[in-house]
């Protein structure tokens, strides 16, 4: 029995974008970055949090079970009869969610053991065997829960499951290094090379991320590293931005894989459920960014695979972005 515990805010089955084959993605809670385009804001803080979907609330007149349960007095009744949450008072205790029949109130983030997580993961073991899939740890940031991540990966490997992580690289190198013996694939985010722009977008500079990436490439097989850049208007959306990252990677090795991810706003509604304001609702892409994004989206629709950086194998989109623009 493996009793090591960690904070998990979601377990997503049948994932096809988080590594080879069909996978189960385990999302670990807690992240040092505050990316303005984060699609999982419920994974930023390392503690259980309340997500409240007011549209699902039955209303205090027909229900109201939650109102007397809150020990902090964070719940009241709005003008439309639905419950209103004062998130400044909420501690995420879960008393309201326990009695909510419509699941308008939900606690995200709970402490789980390695065995509890793998019990969910192994339910789809037959699909992993046929597709070459397995378990992927994501977040949040995996490196924030290094001991739990290592225990999960080690036990998954012992049970014959394929293993992968998705990381920003924002963590201590010894933590990342400790995971390597138990990993088949690493997805590594490099959002932006410009230090100050990275700080403005994520809250922190990228020195540690790039330093850890260089160390990783020195000790881990390049063909098992997939570098990802989520396309973000105002951050890395121009041809020059993407080309700079491509050239940086080629300076390390042509056998790395590079994946450009189209811009999306999937996580925007979650901010409201957490009582937060989405930080990027007003972002409007420039004409150049819109053109690059349109080409990227068309390319991704045709080719789902990752893109080798080798000129001999390079994909049309990436090669086009590498070429100097006409003046």
Residue ranges with predicted function:
Residues 1-20, 222, 233-327:
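Auxiliary Fe-S-binding modules of radical SAM enzymes
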Residues 35, 90-96, 100, 156, ...:
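Hydrophobic packing within well-folded, soluble alpha/beta domains
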Residues 8-62, 83-92:
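N-terminal pre-triad scaffold of radical SAM enzymes
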Residues 115-266, 270-272:
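Conserved AdoMet/S-adenosylmethionine-binding subsite of the radical SAM
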Residues 59-61, 65-68, 116:
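General zinc-binding finger modules coordinated by cysteine/histidine
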Residues 52-58, 109-124:
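Extended, non-globular alpha-helical segments
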Residues 36-43, 64-85, 95-111:
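Iron-sulfur cluster-binding cysteine motifs and their immediate structural context
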